[in-house]
Amino acid sequence: MSIHSVECNVGTNPITIETGKMARLADGAVVVRSGDTVVLVTVVSATKVKEGQTFFPLSVEYKEKAAAAGMFPGGYFKREGRPTEKEILTCRMTDRPLRPMFPKGYFYDTQVITLLLSADGENEPDILSINGASAACVVSDLPFAEPVGAVRVGRIDGQFVINPTNSQREHSQLDLVFAGTKDQVIMIEGSANELPEEDFIAALRVAQENVKVICEKQEELRAVCGKEKRAYELCLAKPELLEIGYEIAGDRIEEAIYAPSKVERQKKVGALRDEVEAAIKERHPEATDFDVEQVFEYIQKKAFRISIMEKDKRADGRALKQLRPLTAEVNVLPPVVHGSAMFARGETMSLCLATLAPMEERQYMDNYTGSVNEKRFILHYNFPPFSVGDTGRFGGQNRREIGHGALAERSIAPVVPGEQEFPYAIRVSSEIMESNGSTSMASVCAGTMSLLAAGVPLKRPVAGISVGLVTEQNDQHEITSYKTLLDIIGSEDFYGDMDFKLCGTSEGVTGYQLDLKLPGIPLSILEEAIHVAKAGRTDVLKVMNEAIAAPAQMSPNAPRIETTKIPADRIGELIGPGGKNIKAIQAESGADINIEEDGTVHIYAAKQEGLDRALELVTRMFKTIEIGELYTGKIVSTTTFGAFMEVLPGKDGLIHISELAEGRTAKTEDVVSVGDVVTAKCIGIDDKGRVKMSIRAALRDAKAAEAEAAGITE
């Protein structure tokens, strides 16, 4: 057994990458460790291409084992179940920087698996998964362009922190995951608390410096134990078929791909493709559908890129930095929906519905790694097939929908008010009505407006915009020229080189995600894209503010909530024996009450009257009975020597028979009965805390007040 390892001294804790000890039958396998968090990452690629394979079948799996945190899995079977949202997001985060590093046309089935073996609760395994996936490919015999490194950047007290621990992240204003090569960026994602663009760019530069260290260490590992690269074949368009394709479509493809609408464009492109297919199969009957598809896609992509680079011409006729027509509208649904909004950008449209609920509706998550295990703001993204004029599977969420929802959620979350200011659980559901690029950014805009329409006091509105990229490269795959595109449509995403999504307020950045089809771009290009996005975001915010600029009144159908605080050591008094007191308050007011361990009491009611009554009853329970004050309450029992009244919830006082009325009272029941509501004055509290009340004294005070008001003096 030959074991080799390298140590990357970056961030809070060094990252160790080791190979040769575990999973030695995989094409590549490494164990990555930071602190006491350990992951195993493997890669295996098939040696033959499956018949009919038309794309690069790269699958990335990430699994958190309960044993890694010294825990038992929940559920009846006590086994890990289907992937959690966090696992799916980590899969996507690991996949995106790897995919561009394989050669174009490499269609061999390839699988990367990351297993969390140990979790110390402080060092997040997602960064280890990305670094491990790259290292496993680097030491394997797979055709992998060059090492990819990844770091997380936080910003605490104005200082950038590399790979902050979970404890440090709680105080960070930035959560940036950066993946790249030694000198180029491939992928970023994360969130920030309205970070100015200049500071955001500074964070990217710091990340690039540290990623370089990790990439160099992977190269060291490859030098001592890397396998010789395997032989493989690439599935590319055949020259003889390309010649036929250009003969048929070369002069007509531009007219087809630059039709004004998506539907018309699809019709023209489809008709031209059929002509190309017929011509190819007539001359080469052995040609497959895939051969035809490769030829036609090559011609389309080439025409698209030439038009952008040489003519500054976009498919829908816009200038390179021009937005599509914008539409913003709130309250598009009846007020039974707490808040609704619709945002459209060209042929992309999102309808968002905001719902408010008691805090007990917040989402709780199984968490083995020590990161967030609950959240009160949730955004769900739904992409039905009709949004692209298609049929297909409906219901349930795929990885793409989960990823888009997470991006929109973390982009809006920084402006959502805290629990103390707005004690609600909040859910936004984004329903994509039409899709032609950047539906996640439309979800951010519509989601923001729906929250304002629901009365949520956001710090500031958030808007999102996408920036695309088209490049020209030399034989060494170096970028020689490029054009950035604002607000890209679907075809520009498909045929372009970049989809960079940036969200923020008028004050700064809140969320971002970069996806590339290239094996990296210089930071300077990304910095330019950030400034382009900022200008576009400003224009989008203007349109949104015209629709709604401030929180509206809450819907009458939204729950009413009040929060109060009681001493933590007196929670039992509010609950009462067997829940007697709290049940009585809820029954009388119609409200729901939730008590936290620190004594915070959340009161929820459908109507304001019930909320006010419940708050009054809770407040009264923790008031101190004072001598000389008047109190109104029910008679709870009678005796031969008097009656007991409920002075405050859970606190009774005795009205002696002599204090029930003026003159002599023969029998208590002659004056009061159980259930009567009376007003009495506290006339004393003995050393044992027993309260003495008097109806007679209350009546005397009332008569004296009436006489004084009438100007009568004795």
UniProtKB/Swiss-Prot annotation:
GO terms for molecular function: 3'-5'-RNA exonuclease activity; magnesium ion binding; polyribonucleotide nucleotidyltransferase activity; RNA binding. Mg(2+) binds at D493, D499. PROSITE patterns: KH_TYPE_1, S1. It is found in: Cytoplasm. It catalyses: RNA(n+1) + phosphate = RNA(n) + a ribonucleoside 5'-diphosphate. It is an enzyme of class 2 (transferase). The keyword Transferase applies. InterPro entries: ExoRNase_PH_dom1, ExoRNase_PH_dom2, ExoRNase_PH_dom2_sf, KH_dom, KH_dom_type_1, KH_dom_type_1_sf, NA-bd_OB-fold, PNPase. Its EC number is 2.7.7.8. Keywords: Cytoplasm, Magnesium, Metal-binding, Nucleotidyltransferase, RNA-binding, Transferase. One of its GO terms (biological process) is mRNA catabolic process. GO terms for cellular component: cytosol. The keyword RNA-binding applies. It holds the Pfam family S1. Its cofactor is Mg(2+). It comes from the Bacteria. Residues 628-696 form the S1 motif domain. Residues 559-618 form the KH domain. Involved in mRNA degradation. Catalyzes the phosphorolysis of single-stranded polyribonucleotides processively in the 3'- to 5'-direction. Belongs to the polyribonucleotide nucleotidyltransferase family. This is Polyribonucleotide nucleotidyltransferase.
